[in-house]
Amino acid sequence: AIGHSLGGMSILNAIRENLKVKKAVIIGSGDIIQDIIDDFIKKLKLKPEIGIKLRDHFEKKYEVKMNYYSASNAAKEVSIPVLIIHDENDVDVNVKAAHNINENLKNSELMITKNLGHRKILGNTEVIKRIVEFIKE
C-alpha cells in the first residue's frame, strides 16, 4: 500500500484495523490530527475555537478521541515494514511528522529528501526508484 499526505495516515490506520498488506510506503504523511486541523483553520483564517469545536463534535459523535487516528498513534500497532519518505523542506507537513511516525513504528526505514516539498517528491526519480526497491525486497 502506498499513500501520500492524508493517505499515509489512512494507510497506517487501515493496517491497524487489519488491512492485510505486506509492506507500506507513506510519503509526506501528516501525523497529529489536531495539528492538521489547526493548520487548515489557520490557512483559512478562521477562529481557533473552530478547531476545538470540530474536535469536540467528532469525539462526541464517534465516541473516540481524535488523537486515536494520529499516524504516530496508529504506527504503534503496525508491525509490517514501512518506508517513510518525507522532504525536509515540506511546507505543508513538517518533517517532524516523519520522525515521530518513524519512532513509533517497529519495522521502518526513513528516507529524507531535500528541496522536493510536498508534491514534487511524488515524481522524483530517486524516490520512485527507492519505492520500487523497497517493494521488491
Go through the PLM ranges and name each one.
Residues 3-7:
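Gly/Ala-rich beta-loop-alpha elbow adjacent to hydrolase catalytic centers
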Residues 13-64:
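Hydrolase active-site cap/lid region
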Residues 71, 80, 94-103:
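Short alpha-helix in the alpha/beta-hydrolase fold that links the catalytic acid
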Residues 77-79, 84-86, 90:
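Short beta-strand/loop motif that positions the catalytic acidic residue
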Residues 116-128:
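Catalytic histidine-centered segment of alpha/beta-hydrolase-like enzymes
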Residues 130-137:
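C-terminal alpha-helix
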